[in-house]
Amino acid sequence: WRMVWEQNVSTVIMATNTEERKEPKCAKYWPSGDPQSYGDLMVVNLGENHLVDYTIRSFSVQRAQGDSTMSIKRNITQYHFTSWPDFGVPKSPSGILKFLRKIKHSSPTGYGPIVV
C-alpha cells in the first residue's frame, strides 16, 4: 500500500486467485470487513462488485497527516480476474478481453502507473 500511495496509483490489477487447488498462491493484501492499518496508511474496503470473470473492489486509502484530525484520502480500484483456471488457459478469450476493456475504459488519467 505504501508503493501505491507513493506512486499515486489509482488502479491495481490482480491476475491470479489467492488459492490454487486449495493451496495458498497469493497473499490477500486487502481488508474485507474492518479497516486495516499498514503503517501510517488506513485501507478501507468500500465495496465489491462480483462479475462472471472478475471482481472490482473499491478502496479508500487514508494517510494521517501530522495532527490526527488532518488526513489525505485517495480512492483505489482493484480489478481482480477470477476466471483463470488453476492449470492451463481459459477455453475462450472473451472473459480476459472484457476484463482488459473494462480496465482500459475505467482507469482515470493523471495518476501514477497501473500496478499489476
From Swiss-Prot:
In this chain the Tyrosine-protein phosphatase domain maps to 1-116
Entry similarity comment: Belongs to the protein-tyrosine phosphatase family.
Checking CDD domains in the record gives: PTPc (cd00047)
Q: Which residues are noted in the entry as substrate-binding? A: D86
EC number in record:
3.1.3.48
Q: What is this protein called?
A: Tyrosine-protein phosphatase 10
Q: Which domain of life is it from?
A: Eukaryota
A single Pfam family it belongs to is Y_phosphatase
MF term (GO), any:
protein tyrosine phosphatase activity
State the organism of origin: Styela plicata
- Which residue spans traverse the membrane? none
What reaction is this protein's catalytic activity?
A: O-phospho-L-tyrosyl-[protein] + H2O = L-tyrosyl-[protein] + phosphate
UniProt keyword list: Hydrolase, Protein phosphatase
Entry-linked InterPro entries: Prot-tyrosine_phosphatase-like (IPR029021), Protein-Tyr_Phosphatase (IPR050348), PTP_cat (IPR000242)
Gene that produces this protein? STY-10
